[in-house]
C-alpha cells in the first residue's frame, strides 16, 4: 500500500514499539477500511463490437471493505536483519457473510476460501520481505516479493512466478570530507509485469480481479504501486545529504502496462509499440525546525505515448512514434507537531 491514491476512512491498530522475545523482536499492524468507487465513467461508454456487444460494462455499484496485516520480525542473532509478511484482502461489503469477514486479514491468510461462490471470492495479495541494514558500511539492501490472487503457500511453491511481482533495491552512504555530510547512492527495481505465458492465457495482471472489477483502487486510483498494473520501473538516485538537507539527481525508466501491450498487439506481432518513459530530475528537501519542505522537478520523455506508433508505407520499422516531453513539478510542505513523545524520541537520539 502506498500514497498514490487519496486517503480513505480506516482503523489502524499497531505496536508502538518492538515487542522483545527470546528469539528477537516483533512489530505488527492491522488496518481495516472502506474503499469507494470512482465518480467518473470512461469517455465513451456506448461503443459496441459488431454493433451487438457493448464494450463497456458498468462496474458494480457497491462499497468494498479492505483489511490488511503486516508483521515484522528481527532475529536477535543478526543485527540489522528484518523479515516481514504482509497480507491484504478486499471484498464487497454486500458479500460479507459474517463479522469474521471484517477481520479477514487475520483469519484467512492461509485459507483458500474453498466452497465460496466465485462471484463472492475476495481479492487477495500477500508478500514476503527482507531488509538488511549494515550499520558500519552505511548501507542497506531490501527485497519484497508478492503474489496477486494469493491462493496459499502450496500454490506459491508450485508456481512462484505466476501472478508474482517484486521490489529490489539498495542504498549506500559515502562519507564526504565535511563532517556529517554524505553522498547517497541508491537503486531500485519494481516489476509488476507478468510473464507473457500467464498474462496472455489468463488475461490477468497485478491489481486487477475478475470479480472485484474495480481492482485494488480507491476512487479509481491505485492504492498500490503508483506505476499501476503490468508495469516495470527502474530508478537510480544520487544525492548529497546531511541531517537537515538533501539535494540530488534521479533517473527513471518506466515500462507502461506490458500486460496490456501483449494482450492488444501480440497477435499482430508488432513489437514496436512499447510505451516507455525516460525521466531525469532534481529532488530534495530541507528541514527547518518542525517544518519540512520537499520538492522535485522532472523532465519526462514518453516514447510511443499510449502505445501509439503509426507508420506510413516505406517508413523504417524503428522510427519516431507518438513521442512527447512533459515537465512535472512537485512541492510539499509538512509540519511536524511538537508532541511530547516525539521530543522524548529526539532527546534519546
What are these regions (language model features)?
Residues 74-349:
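Exposed, low-structure sequence patches enriched in small/polar residues
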Residues 1-84:
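Internal, well-ordered domain-core segments that constitute the primary functional module
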Amino acid at each position: 500500500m502506498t500514497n498514490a491514491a487519496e486517503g480513505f476512512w480506516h482503523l489502524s491498530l499497531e505496536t508502538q514499539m518492538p515487542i522483545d522475545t527470546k528469539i528477537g523482536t516483533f512489530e505488527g499492524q492491522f488496518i481495516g477500511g472502506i474503499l469507494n468507487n470512482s465518480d467518473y465513467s470512461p469517455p465513451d461508454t456506448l461503443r459496441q463490437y459488431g454493433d451487438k456487444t457493448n464494450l463497456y460494462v458498468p462496474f458494480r455499484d457497491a462499497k468494498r471493505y479492505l483489511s490488511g496485516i503486516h508483521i515484522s520480525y528481527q532475529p536477535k542473532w543478526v543485527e540489522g536483519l528484518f523479515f516481514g509478511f504482509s497480507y491484504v484482502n478486499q471484498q464487497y461489503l454486500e458479500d460479507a457473510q459474517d463479522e469474521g469477514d471484517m477481520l479477514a486479514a487475520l483469519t484467512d491468510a492461509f485459507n483458500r476460501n474453498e466452497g465460496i461462490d466465485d462471484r463472492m471470492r475476495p481479492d487477495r495479495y500477500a508478500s514476503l520481505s527482507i531488509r538488511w541494514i549494515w550499520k558500519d558500511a552505511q548501507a542497506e539492501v531490501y527485497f519484497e516479493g508478492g503474489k496477486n490472487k494469493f491462493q496459499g503457500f502450496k500454490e506459491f511453491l508450485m508456481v512462484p512466478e505466476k501472478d508474482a511481482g517484486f521490489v529490489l533495491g539498495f542504498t549506500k552512504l559515502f562519507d564526504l570530507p565535511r563532517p556529517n555530510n554524505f553522498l547517497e547512492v541508491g537503486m531500485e527495481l519494481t516489476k509488476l509485469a507478468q510473464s507473457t505465458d500467464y498474462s496472455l492465457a489468463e488475461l490477468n495482471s497485478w491489481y486487477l480481479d475478475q470479480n472485484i472489477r474495480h481492482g485494488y483502487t480507491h476512487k479509481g486510483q491505485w492504492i498500490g504501486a503508483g506505476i499501476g498494473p503490468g508495469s516495470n520501473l527502474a530508478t537510480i538516485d544520487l544525492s548529497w545529504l546531511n541531517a537537515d538537507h538533501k539535494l540530488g539527481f534521479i533517473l527513471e525508466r518506466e515500462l507502461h502496462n506490458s500486460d496490456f501491450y501483449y494482450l492488444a498487439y501480440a497477435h499482430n506481432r508488432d513489437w514496436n509499440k512499447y510505451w516507455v518513459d525516460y525521466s531525469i530530475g532534481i529532488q530534495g528537501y530541507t528541514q527547518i525546525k518542525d517544518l519540512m519542505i520537499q520538492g522535485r522537478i522532472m523532465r519526462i520523455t514518453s516514447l510511443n505515448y499510449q502505445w501509439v506508433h503509426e507508420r506510413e508505407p516505406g517508413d523504417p520499422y524503428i522510427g519516431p512514434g507518438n513521442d512527447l516531453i512533459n515537465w512535472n513539478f512537485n512541492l510539499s510542505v509538512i509540519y511536524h507537531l511538537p508532541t511530547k513523545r516525539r521530543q522524548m524520541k529526539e532527546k534519546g537520539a
